[in-house]
């Protein structure tokens, strides 16, 4: 990768955001790290410096556009601009549609979808000037829509749709766009879980813990795919296979999801 090697990462205080920062830090990049978890941010910044990078950390709640604007201004002042923006901050949620409240929906959409929209909006002038890149973190849930997590599915599907829109709109401005859609991997995402169905949280937690893939693995794969110019980045092999099947025979996937929904409902009633 060329450019000036300056990256901003939201949700950098832990998990995937931290590992993305560290992966680019090992290449000598300067990192602007943001999160609502200030203690986690301090840890990430120390790790970034140990890995060979540098930069600064600034608290930022992606629900607040003014905080994102302030972060963009800090990137301008401290780094002279930005080359890659990673909209990674996100939260977990789940529950059957009839049990989810509108407040559950508002919370999920405000962070996982509108946080990405606002991040793109706040940083577009900087990446447009540097002819840089935007990396939005979505999920395989955006493509496969598992039952019992409709608000999460919708938010992440919105991130994919936004990224597709930006891909075509910004090509002429020489701004690259990528969207990352990981499946389950070892992460602390469930610390943020909100939802009315405890059994779904337990089921998802078990899947996360059982995954052989770590956040560092995802970050490594992301680095390689961005370097190759891949738009939709699917780091899990089973995710790539499932997406291919859905494109060829969507009804087969829907039928499978109906069975899965009944299994989840039965477990929630047990």
Map each language-model feature to its residues:
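The beta1-alpha1 cofactor-binding region of Rossmann-like NAD(H)/NADP(H)-dependent oxidoreductases
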Residues: 38-39, 59-70, 102
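SDR active-site lid
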Residues: 172-237
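Conserved glycine-rich cofactor-binding loop
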Residues: 11-15
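Active-site helix of classical SDR
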Residues: 120, 155
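Active-site loop immediately N-terminal to the catalytic Tyr-X3-Lys motif
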Residues: 98, 146-150
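Substrate-binding pocket helix/loop in short-chain dehydrogenase/reductase
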Residues: 96-97, 101-107
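Residue(s) in the substrate-gating loop at a strand-loop-helix junction
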Residues: 139
């Amino acid at each position: 990768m060329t450019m000036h090697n300056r990256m901003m990462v939201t949700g950098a205080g832990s998990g995937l955001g931290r590992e993305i920062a560290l992966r680019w830090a090992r290449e000598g990049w300067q990192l602007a790290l943001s999160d609502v978890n200030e203690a986690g941010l301090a840890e990430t910044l120390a790790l970034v410096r140990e890995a060979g990078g540098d930069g600064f950390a600034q608290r930022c709640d992606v629900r607040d556009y003014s905080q994102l604007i302030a972060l963009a201004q800090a990137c301008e002042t401290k780094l002279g601009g930005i080359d890659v923006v990673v909209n990674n901050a996100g939260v977990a949620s789940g529950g059957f549609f009839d049990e989810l409240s509108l407040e559950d929906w508002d919370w999920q959409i405000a962070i996982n979808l509108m946080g990405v929209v606002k991040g793109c909006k706040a940083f577009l002038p900087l990446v447009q000037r540097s002819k840089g890149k935007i990396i939005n973190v979505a999920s395989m849930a955006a493509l496969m829509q598992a039952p019992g997590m409709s608000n999460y599915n919708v938010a992440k599907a919105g991130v994919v749709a936004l990224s597709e829109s930006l891909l075509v709109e910004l090509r002429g401005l020489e701004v690259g766009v990528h969207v990352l859609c990981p499946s389950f991997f070892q992460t602390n995402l469930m610390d943020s879980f909100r939802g009315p169905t405890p059994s779904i949280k337990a089921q998802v937690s078990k899947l996360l813990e059982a995954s052989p893939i770590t956040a560092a693995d995802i970050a490594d794969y992301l680095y390689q795919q961005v370097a190759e110019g891949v738009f939709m980045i699917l780091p899990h092999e089973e995710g790539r296979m499932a997406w291919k099947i859905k494109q060829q025979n969507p009804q087969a996937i829907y039928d499978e999801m109906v069975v899965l929904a009944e299994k989840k409902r039965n477990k929630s009633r047990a």
